Amino acid sequence: MKADIHPAYHTIKVVMTDGTEYETRSTWGSEGAVMNLEIDPKSHPAWTGGNQQLMDRGGRVSKFNKRFGGLGL
């Protein structure tokens, strides 16, 4: 097996949309980094039955609707 080809694992903190936090090991970020989730199993329509609206934090949905809303598909 080749040496030094595998990514380093380290501990990060994950913050869910409701504010709950937990620590896990990941290759994402660096040691002690914080990952803030915009969508998680508690807020995703696939797991909540589709009744909850997605939050448009990045403005991507509104930008898409503004650009292509008049097509009337």
UniProtKB/Swiss-Prot annotation:
Molecular function GO labels: rRNA binding; structural constituent of ribosome
| SUPFAM superfamilies in UniProt | L28p-like
Family annotation (PROSITE patterns) = RIBOSOMAL_L31
- InterPro entries attached here? Ribosomal_bL28/bL31-like_sf, Ribosomal_bL31, Ribosomal_bL31_A, Ribosomal_bL31_sf
Q: Which domain of life is it from?
A: Bacteria
Write one Pfam family the protein is assigned to. Ribosomal_L31
Q: What does this protein do?
A: Binds the 23S rRNA.
Q: How does it assemble?
A: Part of the 50S ribosomal subunit.
Family of this protein = Belongs to the bacterial ribosomal protein bL31 family. Type A subfamily.
Q: What is this protein called?
A: Large ribosomal subunit protein bL31
Q: Its encoding gene is what?
A: rpmE
